C-alpha cells in the first residue's frame, strides 16, 4: 500500500520520475533503457504508438510474459503483435478494447450532463464494468465464431466491425 500511495502522490504532484521511486524503495533503475528486457508476467506498454517492434517482442516473449496488455494506442507494430499472439501461453489484450474504458467513461459523462444527472462513483464504475465486460464477451464470442480460438485482437476487430456495419445498415447506409 505504501508503494501505491507513493505512486499516486508522484502522479498527482507531477513528479512522475521512475528514478525517485527506485531510490525511495531501493529497486533497480536503468536510466535511458526501455523495460522490455525485464522478466515479467504482465507487460503493459503505455507510452506511444509503435514503441514495441519485433526485436522487443521477441525479448518480451523470451522473458516469459503471460499477459501483454496494450495500454497506449497501438503501442505495438503489426509484425510484433502478430509474433506475440503466436506465442503459446501469451494472452494479448488489444489497445482498441483496453482503451475503450476511457471512451466509455467520456460517454457516460456526456450522458449525465445531457440528462442533468449526477451518478455516484460506484454507479459510474458499475456501468463502466458492464461496458468493459460486454466488450470482452463480444471479442471472445467473435473470435470463437470465426474459429480463431482465444484471439482477443481478431475478436475485437471483428466485433467492432460488426457493430459499425450493423449501425450503418440500420441507418440505410450500405
Can you say where each PLM-predicted feature lies in the sequence?
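Rossmann-fold NAD(P) dinucleotide-binding segment
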Residues: 29-40, 50-67
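Short glycine-rich anion-binding loops that position phosphate/pyrophosphate groups of nucleotides
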Residues: 48-50, 74
Amino acid at each position: 500500500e505504501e508503494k501505491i500511495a507513493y505512486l499516486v502522490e508522484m502522479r498527482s504532484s507531477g513528479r512522475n520520475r521512475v528514478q525517485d521511486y527506485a531510490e525511495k524503495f531501493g529497486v533497480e533503475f536503468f536510466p535511458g533503457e526501455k523495460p522490455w528486457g525485464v522478466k515479467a508476467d504482465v507487460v503493459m506498454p503505455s507510452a506511444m504508438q509503435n514503441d514495441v517492434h519485433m526485436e522487443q517482442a521477441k525479448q518480451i516473449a523470451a522473458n516469459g510474459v503471460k499477459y501483454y496488455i496494450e495500454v497506449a494506442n497501438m503501442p505495438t507494430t503489426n509484425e510484433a503483435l502478430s509474433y506475440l499472439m503466436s506465442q503459446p501461453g501469451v494472452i494479448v489484450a488489444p489497445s482498441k478494447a483496453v482503451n475503450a474504458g476511457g471512451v466509455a467513461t467520456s460517454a457516460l459523462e456526456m450522458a449525465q450532463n445531457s440528462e442533468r444527472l449526477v451518478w455516484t462513483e460506484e454507479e459510474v464504475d458499475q456501468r463502466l464494468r458492464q461496458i468493459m465486460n460486454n466488450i470482452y464477451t463480444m471479442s471472445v464470442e467473435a473470435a470463437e465464431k470465426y474459429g480463431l480460438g482465444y484471439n482477443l485482437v481478431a475478436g475485437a476487430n471483428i466485433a467492432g466491425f460488426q457493430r459499425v456495419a450493423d449501425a450503418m445498415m440500420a441507418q440505410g447506409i450500405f
